[in-house]
Regions:
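Structural/interface elements that position substrates and couple domains in central-metabolism enzymes
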Residues: 1-216, 223-225
Length: 225
């Protein structure tokens, strides 16, 4: 689905509609058909490596599984490429990250996409401000120069862009009218297809393209929606 999301972003289609259509086929089902910034944790990375090593020992080429790992490894960087397209020079820009754990309801940051994203942002000279309800202290050991907030709303203050990396409930259910006023530039990147896209008065349906609302000029960049 992540590769289809990349294609969808180029041709203006809705990857959610594609996944819903695929999920209607009983041979496939709707589970695990969600595009995003990539999986992490201790299970999928470890298990896929173990299976590949087993196959290699027996002379079997698991090319699809190798591609899965390749796409997953590059997905966070592809996500950041969309930010660079709108803001080529990130030096000194205040970039907000919402969610640091590899998934909601855990403080596990092993193989978390947020780490790849933060490393790339740091190399670009961006000022990183991040929020996670339970994982911030773990990430702070790796990125001590980043700023960490105690509330999700606080990361938006003066931000030039905001990236949803982990779809914690408190990172999704926000007062968007207030958020728009807090940001220096209302540039939003949804890495989990979790932020509202329709009916809020702030966001319009669309994809990786500039959107204009009746209230103010703002942008919502959903993951190939």
């Amino acid at each position: 689905m992540n590769e289809l999301a990349r294609l969808s972003s180029e041709i203006g289609t809705d990857v959610l509609t594609i996944s819903q259509g695929m999920g209607l086929d009983s041979r496939i089902g709707p589970q695990f058909l969600r595009a995003g910034v990539g999986y992490g944790g201790s299970c999928f990375p470890k298990d896929t490596i173990a299976l590949l090593n087993l196959a290699k020992r027996h002379g079997v080429n698991l090319s699809i599984l190798e591609k899965v790992r390749e796409v997953n490894a590059t997905q966070p960087l592809w996500f950041l490429e969309q930010l660079h397209k709108q803001m080529p020079d990130l030096y000194g820009k205040r970039i907000a990250l919402l969610g640091l754990a590899f998934k909601p309801d855990t403080d596990d940051i092993r193989e978390a996409p947020s780490l790849t994203i933060m490393d790339a942002l740091q190399r670009s000279g961006a000022q990183i401000v991040a929020y996670d309800p339970v994982a911030s202290n773990h990430v702070k050991e790796l990125f001590p120069d980043a700023e960490y907030t105690s509330t999700p709303e606080a990361v938006f203050q003066g931000a030039h862009a905001a990236l949803l990396v982990t779809e914690w409930k408190e990172c999704v259910e926000l007062d968007w009218a207030k958020i728009m006023e807090m940001m220096e530039v209302p540039l939003l990147f949804d890495g989990r297809n979790a932020w509202p896209a329709r009916g809020s008065g702030i966001f319009l349906s669309g994809g990786w393209k500039k959107l204009t609302t009746p209230l103010q000029e703002s942008w919502l960049f959903l993951l190939a929606r």
